[in-house]
Every structure is written in structure tokens, then in C-alpha cells.
């Protein structure tokens, strides 16, 4: 059993009780999400320079942004890879990332990159409990939340 499954009380990745009956699908984590963007170069610059992600090229010339054990695949508006969302559009995402540094350092870095802080720091509730967050926008206007867990 995976550590996350054990922590969440999940039986196994397929949700089986004894291996005989599948009663539900149990998901373990997010592998990747897709952002549809207007300008892939501006997006890569923002996410690497401001948020510290790593540019990844895969499957020929496809682009992604890696961080932690996750990635964001990038699709250019009007030239999306199949299959894709029913109505892919730039600027429609609202994403929250956990920072690997104290929030004050993250805020100082974002400001040093001449990116406006839209709100924060403010208390919020994350997937595993209380967080402290601040908000900014990427080049397409997606709302980006950067957070630290609160003790």
C-alpha cells in the first residue's frame, strides 16, 4: 500500500477490498494538469523565472513545466493536442501551489520579479488543513495562489 493511501485510509489504488470485487476507484494524487496558453514562451518564462519551475520538452516538441513530483503540460490556444478539454481557453485556471520556502521569501521573490501581488498574505484552507496564501496572475490571467501550511 502506498504511504498516501495508508494516510488516507485507502485500501488500494483500485479500491478493491480483497482483490475480488471492485467497489470504487480510489485516486492517489495528481500527475499533471494542462494549461491552455496564448504565448508559450511568455508562459515558460513566467513559471520558470517567477515560480521556479523547470521547463521540460517531451514527445518531440511538446512543452511542460515540472515542479516537485508534478507537471503542467502546455497547450497553445487553437493548436491543442488531442484529446483536450471541451472548451480550452487561456486564463480560466485557478491553481494553488505549496511553496518550498517561507511565504515571506516567496513574496519578496515575486516582487523582485516585478510581478504584482493581487492579495495576501491571507489565511485559507488547503487540501490538508490551514494555509497562508498570496495571489498573483500569470501572463494569461490565470489566478495563481502560493501557500505555506500554517501550524
Model-derived features with residue positions:
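Short, basic/aromatic recognition patches
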Residues: 118-126
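Low-complexity, intrinsically disordered Gly/Pro/Thr-rich segments
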Residues: 121, 130-133
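Short, small/polar residue-rich loop motifs at catalytic or cofactor-binding pockets
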Residues: 59, 128-131
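Glyoxalase I/VOC metalloenzyme domain signal
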Residues: 1-4, 8-31, 35-57, 67-119, ...
